[in-house]
């Protein structure tokens, strides 16, 4: 089993962090090729340094009235390493994407550095590790849990890991995060909410992020009232483009408050040219 740069085994580093995504119980303390949950004997494989903890579900499983034909197709993307490689190469190749990444780095670093130092940070979805460097720069001593529903993305992130940094890798669903309540100091969740078409999915993800975070959550959303989305809505009757998947800041503020978190700030990625905002939610109490 892998060790982090400080010589601590995966089992030791994650003993008080992980929980079974199927039932929430802790895992048995010793594992090498699989994880076994203590209460219900659910088994999850460990292969090539990656913990396979993703479980599939939809809003039908959460006993809500909303239909469940939602983000399933998106969740199936990037299961293969080759697909993930093409996606990440696009961000490295295009000048506009590189500029966006630089701005995202600044926003992530600003949010993390504004909070007390972290020991554990969950990066979900980590993708191919595009934004992992920003987290590591802002929290150099933290153990970063790199998680994504796409196995190919996690494989790519592991192959392109950050030398000398403490990283662990796993597949995971944002709807069933395999982490104990308040199991990590913080969660970074970038570029996911705008892929979830229904309120049920958005609320489920938000509740999971706040559940597992002890101190704060950084998350992005596409603002319904942004300049970019306003122009899109104005043009829609003429160009017939479908509406963006958006979120209203008041909904985020009120929903987060009901889950025990305060919306502290939400700077724009680019005020005129992007609808994305980087929200910082701080846990109450």
Identify the meaning behind each predicted range.
Residues 2-73:
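N-terminal auxiliary segments of SAM/dcSAM-dependent transferases
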Residues 48, 54-115:
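Conserved class I S-adenosyl-L-methionine
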Residues 188:
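A conserved beta-strand element that flanks and buttresses the S-adenosyl-L-methionine
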Residues 203-215:
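A short glycine-rich, Lys/Arg-flanked "PGG" loop and its adjoining helix->strand segment in the class I
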Residues 222-242:
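Short, glycine-/aromatic-enriched active-site segment of Class I SAM-dependent methyltransferases
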């Amino acid at each position: 089993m892998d060790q982090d740069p400080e010589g601590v085994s995966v089992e030791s580093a994650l003993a008080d962090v992980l929980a079974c995504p199927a039932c929430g119980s802790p895992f048995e303390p010793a594992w090498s090729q699989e994880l076994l949950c203590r209460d219900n004997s659910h088994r999850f494989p460990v292969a090539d340094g990656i913990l396979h903890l993703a479980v599939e579900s939809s809003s039908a499983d959460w006993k809500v009235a909303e239909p469940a034909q939602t983000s399933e197709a998106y969740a199936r993307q990037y299961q293969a390493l080759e697909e993930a490689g093409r996606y990440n190469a696009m961000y490295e190749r295009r000048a506009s994407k590189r500029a966006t990444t630089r701005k995202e780095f600044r926003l992530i670093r600003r949010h993390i550095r504004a909070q007390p130092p972290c020991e554990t940070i969950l990066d979900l979805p980590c993708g191919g590790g595009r934004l992992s460097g920003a987290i590591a720069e802002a929290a150099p001593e933290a153990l970063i849990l790199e998680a994504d529903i796409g196995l190919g993305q996690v494989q790519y992130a592991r192959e392109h890991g950050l030398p000398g940094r403490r990283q662990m890798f796993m597949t995971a669903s944002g709807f069933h995060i395999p982490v104990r309540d308040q199991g990590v100091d913080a969660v970074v969740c970038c570029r996911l909410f705008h892929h979830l078409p229904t309120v049920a999915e958005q609320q489920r993800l938000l509740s999971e992020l706040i559940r597992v975070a002890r101190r704060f959550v950084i998350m992005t959303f596409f603002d319904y009232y942004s300049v970019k989305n306003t122009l899109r809505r104005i043009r829609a009757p003429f160009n017939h483009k479908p509406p963006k998947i958006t979120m209203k800041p008041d909904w985020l503020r009120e929903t987060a408050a009901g889950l025990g978190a305060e919306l502290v700030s939400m700077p724009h990625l680019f005020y005129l040219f992007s609808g994305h905002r980087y929200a910082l939610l701080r846990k109450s109490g």
